Amino acid sequence: MNVNNKLIVIVGAYSTGQYLAPAFISKGYQCIHVQPGATISPFYLDSFRKHDFINNLVWEGDDESIIQELSQFDVKAVIPGSEIAVLLADSLSQKLSLPTTNDPRMSSARRNKYDMQKALEQAGVNSIPVFKTNKSEAIFNWLKSQGIQYPIVLKPISSAGTDGVSICQNQEEVQLAFNELIDTVNALGENNNELLVQPYLHGIEYVVNTVSSNGRHYVTEIIRVNKITINASPVYDYAEVLSPVEHELLYELLSEYVKKVLDALGIHFGAGHSEVMLVNETTPVLIETAARPIGGIDLSAYTESLGYNHISMVAESYLNPENFHKILLPENKLPLRKRLLCTFMISPIHGEICNRPDLMAIKNLPHVHSVLMKTQGVLEKTSTLINCPGFITSLGTNREELMQQHQKIRQYEPHLFLQMVDSTIGLRR
């Protein structure tokens, strides 16, 4: 194997993070992967592309052994590819004394949702009142002391993808959700020893994706998110990329706020994926920020819509910062090349998948760009983004047509999922 010294280290290259290595390889760099633990959740591991790396180093609690392995290379940067990689990437980058290290004092606040909101509060940035506990009675005492009314949100302190999130309308629902969640293992393989409590925010939810370079923050795209509530859990319905030209004032409002968030969390380099609620149409409030790329999207569709994507801009920011600044300077914002709408599939049934889904009717819809659907294993009733059975990405020039197509996809869903679990059809895999 021909190994050069130009090296990028990617920690936890899962989900959309699997495409980081190809982006750097295309620019002449080689990549080493650090697996952030001996055991990785199948939710992540299924997306790992081992062939993109010259080595896969397994971290088992000892940073120094990883540092020793990396010391023979000229490491340009250590980059987290997924949520479970954030803390380890911070630690390795700091110990390698890399100039692209984010503020190590704020590392926990980039992962722990309690510490995150407290960091915003301390910095004077709009935040949500939060409380963490391992006792349900403490929740009720805190709600009373703060004068917080129902509904409230109960969720893990450090998970992702709406995993374990419950919207509770009364004390009984809080107790039920608490009992179901406390001391369980979340979707990322971490223990829910404590839970986070916060008031429910009413408003419109947005995703603000960013890339930072030497403390300068750039918004790559803003996505409006629509969710529905199923059995007290927020479930993704659809998401649409917003035009920075058509929504100029909204872009300015959300961008200015999220940049303050990134400063408060000590993010100077790399990707940011922030979920923001716009309350009363005027006040942005952070739900959470992830210091890694957006997960679970079709990058090719985003490239067609924007002319670039989150991953390509991360690579550009580290290796060609001048061009990166040029592309994302606010005054260079251009209209969308195409409108993008993502439909998240919602299964109302649970069962073993017996048959390949017949997706031809959906694929033949005029604006469908790509279809990603679970085809084996167990089909679960959709309750989180993590057990979402698939998503369909559509591109077009007319928003009304995209929304009509979204509704048509919803009409196909019941038959599609029934067919997948019907053992009498005979198209077994």
Residue ranges and their predicted role:
Residues 1-106, 137, 321-325, 374-387, ...:
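ATP-binding N-terminal substructure of ATP-dependent carboxylate-amine bond-forming enzymes
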Residues 94-164, 171:
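A conserved helix-loop-beta module that forms one wall/lid of the active-site cleft
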Residues 126-128, 149-154, 168-203, 233-238, ...:
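Conserved ATP-binding module of the ATP-grasp superfamily
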Residues 133, 165-170, 211-213, 279:
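Short beta-strand-to-turn element immediately C-terminal to the catalytic PLP-Schiff-base lysine
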Residues 199-267, 271, 278, 290-318:
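ATP-dependent carboxylate/phosphate-activation module, predominantly the ATP-grasp catalytic core
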Residues 272, 362-378:
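A structural supersecondary motif
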Residues 282-284:
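Conserved protein kinase catalytic/activation segment
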Residues 323-366:
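A glycine-rich beta-turn/hairpin centered on an aromatic-Pro dipeptide
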